[in-house]
């Protein structure tokens, strides 16, 4: 890749969104009483009466999506329409939106190819064609952009990328709880360094933040030539830095993190209290941001709540766009389960999926875990997957009454007690089969029953690497559908934990 920034004179990078940009006067009471989507619909209708007739024709092809803090999200049918709004109308629209809401509003533009072009849309055959920056050229030319419509190419998941092929925009289920985060991720993937920089997605564990992070990386690499994407967890970033210091290879470390076009950092909250790593990341952030290279991060909370993070880093994390992901609503949970059974090629009746979705309301990971338990139980007993079976399985998973939060300490203690071993042995390194099985089940239950990320679970198990936790999770999931003993062990330990 060239060192030339993504933005250029013809494609200026939008000004970053900053909390200090919000003006004192409050939003009008009329708009404030509506939900964000209704408020934006009202504003958009008002704006259509104030723009020129040619611009009104262009705006008739747009659809207001939602409001998030000081950002208004609108959808257009294709790249040409987006470029038109970006280059010719952005500042006028932002000014009109700001006037309407009585505060500074940033316009976010995403592409929805399902939108039909209005019959009266202006003819743009004579419009001057804009050429993308030389260093960021698409592999093919397409008229309509949508993540699923992009060309599919082979991505080398080398050490610098390690992007999960299952985590794509196509496989991400969109609902009210994540719609804005998804739209922001797509916007960043389509125009790295131009839309929002940095983009920080925050929310509880198991809600899809990592999925979007990988989807951005895979999308960029599939569509653009010679682009360098680096995905890393904060734990790995810290370990890389410590190893670089110990081996006098800090120059190589800096090159590996700064000579990239898109840097994806997972679980940035774990940077807290790591003073030297924060210092190094501060300079890496500045280098990439000044070169208009894209930075995307995830966190379990917004920057202002990362109290053990240096203020200058918290401030920089707020330069771009902050967007959260909430637990999915019932409709989204059902859609997630439908997608899961289709991917796994298993048959589950709709009423069973609705029943499972109604019982699991916390996060996607636990939702999919419940489905796995139900289908595994049915497979072991050669029974059809029906509601009565689901009730039996989920009764132990979610007992009636008020439930206290599950902690890794409780999971470790109950698992050790079940296998009649000490907690120290369970957390140790012995490869004795009983200890390995107990350790893997405990890791699986931590993954399913808590909000802890993979690196955090690894830390609870004596500093195990996150890949060890991932392997344990996958292995136990598979064995539950194959070995009755494993299924019973997991179910009995879960029941003990839930009845604590």
Swiss-Prot record:
Gene Ontology CC: cytoplasm; plasma membrane
Alphabetical list of InterPro entries matching this protein: AAA+_ATPase, Chromosome_initiator_DnaA, Chromosome_initiator_DnaA-like, Chromosome_initiator_DnaA_CS, DnaA_C, DnaA_dom, DnaA_N_sf, P-loop_NTPase
Name recorded for this polypeptide: Chromosomal replication initiator protein DnaA
Record's keyword terms, sorted: ATP-binding, Cytoplasm, DNA replication, DNA-binding, Lipid-binding, Nucleotide-binding
Compositional bias per record (Pro residues), positions renumbered to this chain: 14-27
Taxonomy, superkingdom: Bacteria
Annotated stretches, region: Domain II: 103-161
Record text about domains: Domain I is involved in oligomerization and binding regulators, domain II is flexibile and of varying length in different bacteria, domain III forms the AAA+ region, while domain IV binds dsDNA.
Organism: Cutibacterium acnes (strain DSM 16379 / KPA171202)
Annotated binding of ATP, by residue: 206, 208-210
């Amino acid at each position: 890749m060239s060192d030339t920034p993504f933005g250029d004179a013809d494609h200026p990078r939008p000004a970053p969104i900053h909390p200090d940009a919000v003006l004192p006067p409050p939003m009008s009471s009329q708009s404030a009483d509506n939900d964000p989507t209704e408020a934006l619909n009202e504003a958009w209708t008002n704006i259509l009466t104030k723009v020129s007739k040619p611009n009104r024709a262009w705006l008739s092809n747009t659809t207001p999506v939602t409001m998030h803090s000081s950002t208004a999200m609108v959808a257009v049918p294709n790249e040409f329409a987006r470029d038109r709004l970006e280059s010719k109308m952005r500042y006028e629209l932002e000014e009109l939106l700001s006037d309407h809401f009585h505060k500074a509003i940033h316009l976010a533009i995403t592409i929805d190819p399902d939108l039909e072009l209005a019959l009266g849309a202006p003819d743009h055959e004579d419009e001057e064609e804009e050429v993308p920056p030389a260093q960021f050229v698409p592999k093919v030319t397409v008229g309509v952009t949508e993540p699923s419509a992009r060309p599919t190419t082979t991505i080398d998941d080398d050490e610098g990328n390690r992007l999960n092929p299952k985590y794509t925009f196509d496989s991400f289920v969109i609902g009210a709880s994540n719609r804005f985060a998804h739209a922001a991720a797509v916007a960043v993937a389509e125009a790295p360094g131009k839309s929002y920089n940095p983009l920080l997605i925050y929310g509880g564990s198991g809600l899809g933040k990592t999925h979007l992070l990988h989807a951005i990386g895979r999308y960029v690499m599939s569509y653009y030539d010679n682009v360098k994407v680096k995905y890393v967890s904060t734990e790995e970033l810290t370990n890389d830095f410590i190893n670089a210091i110990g081996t006098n290879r800090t120059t190589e470390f800096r090159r590996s993190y700064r000579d990239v076009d898109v840097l994806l950092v997972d679980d940035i909250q774990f940077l807290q209290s790591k003073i030297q790593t924060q210092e190094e990341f501060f300079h890496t952030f500045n280098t990439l941001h000044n070169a208009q290279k894209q930075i995307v991060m995830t966190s379990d909370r917004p920057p202002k709540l990362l109290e053990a993070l240096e203020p200058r880093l918290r401030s920089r994390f707020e330069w771009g766009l902050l967007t959260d992901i909430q637990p999915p609503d019932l409709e989204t949970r059902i859609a997630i389960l439908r997608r899961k059974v289709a991917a796994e090629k298993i048959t589950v009746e709709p009423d069973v999926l609705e029943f499972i979705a109604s019982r699991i309301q916390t996060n996607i990971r636990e939702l999919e875990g419940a489905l796995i338990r139900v289908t595994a139980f049915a497979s072991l007993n050669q029974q059809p997957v029906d509601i009565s079976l689901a009730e039996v399985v989920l009764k132990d998973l979610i007992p009636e009454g008020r439930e206290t939060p599950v902690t890794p300490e409780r999971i470790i203690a109950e698992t050790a007690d079940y296998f009649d071993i000490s907690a120290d042995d369970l957390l140790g390194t012995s490869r004795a089969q009983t200890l390995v099985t107990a350790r893997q089940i405990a890791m699986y239950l931590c993954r399913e029953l808590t909000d802890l990320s993979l690196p955090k679970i690894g830390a609870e198990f004596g500093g195990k690497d996150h890949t060890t936790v991932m392997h344990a999770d996958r292995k136990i999931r598979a064995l539950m559908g194959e070995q009755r003993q494993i299924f019973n062990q997991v179910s009995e330990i879960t029941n003990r934990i839930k009845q604590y």
